[in-house]
């Protein structure tokens, strides 16, 4: 099946084999009904694709569908699939889930294989499920959820979360240059050969990423280590953390992606940098420690 990654560079690309996670799901009886549109090269939060069109938001047509996995969220709302797969490097499953009113999980880093996925920033990249319900996401991952509710858990709350005890949980702006350097490394040879095939706002972002210096990268790597320490300390004594998915209202469909990107990823990107599981359900984000995916999903049921 043609797999473009939302890019004109790969317009005629047809993989010779399915990604392992897709092959596993098909072996379990799932049927692939199609591929969905996305933000070019999974590097954007609005799914405004200059090559293949803008992904519509079926629930709220005046607003962005979010990205980068906007097509997966839209397909679920339209009833074109029972479940969908997405990737999430800075919020690309959770943001469209929040914008379109579906459920999406960024699992613990490494829980789902990213083999067969065109990389964006490899140590931040995650693949995960999207569905109309928490149980739908759990089914894709073959996770059995514990029978617990928020009342059974110690819940921390950050950044204006709707429930729980206030927690001083860190954001991750200082880590962004590490993410950018990884993006730059992926495209360092590809971009000069095919620059004219990259969309305009993607070109600008890729050029910034390629320009990240060794010193900026090393500083950001140290900031990532500090983030891990601060996050562990902040969640000490709690089972899960509840936050908003977005730090801003859902932008209009014709927004300028570069102007809304930082605000839309402010609360999602930290969990990519940490590798912790994080669920988006009804605009609420539920996060937990690595390996606690089933617990995060179970807690998320409280918001359905």
Task: Place the predicted regions along the sequence by residue.
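Short, well-ordered beta-strand elements within core beta-sheets of diverse protein domains
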Residues: 9-13, 125-132, 206-212
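Gly/Ser-rich catalytic/binding loops embedded in alpha/beta enzyme cores
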Residues: 1-89
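Structural helix-boundary/capping segments
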Residues: 23, 27, 77-159, 218, ...
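A short glycine-threonine-serine/GTX helix/turn-capping micro-motif
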Residues: 124-131, 174, 191-194
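Short helix-loop capping/hinge segments that flank enzyme active sites or metal/cofactor-binding pockets
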Residues: 1-8, 152-161, 177-228, 232, ...
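Glycine-rich, small-residue loops and helix-cap segments
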Residues: 18, 26-27, 212, 216-304
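Short, hinge-like loop/turn segments at secondary-structure boundaries
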Residues: 50-53, 100-104, 178-183, 260-261
């Amino acid at each position: 099946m043609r797999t473009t990654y939302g890019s004109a560079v790969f317009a005629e690309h047809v993989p010779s084999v399915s990604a392992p996670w897709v092959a596993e799901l098909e072996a379990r009886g799932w049927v692939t009904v199609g591929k969905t549109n996305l933000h070019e090269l999974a590097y954007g939060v609005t799914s405004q694709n200059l090559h293949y069109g803008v992904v519509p938001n079926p629930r709220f047509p005046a607003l962005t569908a979010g990205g980068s996995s906007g097509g997966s969220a839209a397909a679920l709302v339209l009833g074109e699939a029972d479940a969908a797969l997405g990737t999430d490097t800075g919020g690309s499953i959770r943001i469209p889930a929040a914008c379109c009113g579906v459920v999406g999980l960024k699992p613990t880093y490494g829980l789902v294989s990213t083999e067969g996925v065109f990389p964006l920033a490899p140590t931040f990249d995650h693949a995960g499920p999207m569905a109309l319900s928490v149980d739908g996401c759990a089914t894709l991952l073959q996770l059995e959820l514990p029978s617990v509710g928020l009342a059974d858990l110690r819940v921390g709350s950050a950044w204006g979360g709707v429930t729980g005890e206030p927690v001083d949980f860190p954001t991750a702006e200082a880590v962004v240059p590490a993410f950018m350097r990884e993006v730059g490394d992926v495209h360092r040879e590809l971009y000069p050969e095919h620059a004219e095939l990259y969309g305009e706002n993607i070109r600008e972002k890729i050029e910034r990423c390629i320009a990240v210096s060794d010193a900026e990268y090393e500083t950001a790597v140290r900031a990532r280590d500090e983030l891990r320490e601060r996050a562990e300390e902040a969640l000490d004594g709690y089972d899960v953390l509840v936050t908003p998915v977005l730090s801003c209202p859902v932008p209009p469909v014709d927004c300028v992606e570069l102007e809304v990107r930082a605000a839309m990823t402010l609360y999602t990107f930290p969990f990519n940098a940490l590798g912790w599981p994080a669920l988006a359900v009804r605009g609420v984000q539920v996060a937990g420690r690595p390996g606690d995916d089933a617990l995060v999903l179970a807690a998320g049921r409280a918001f359905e």
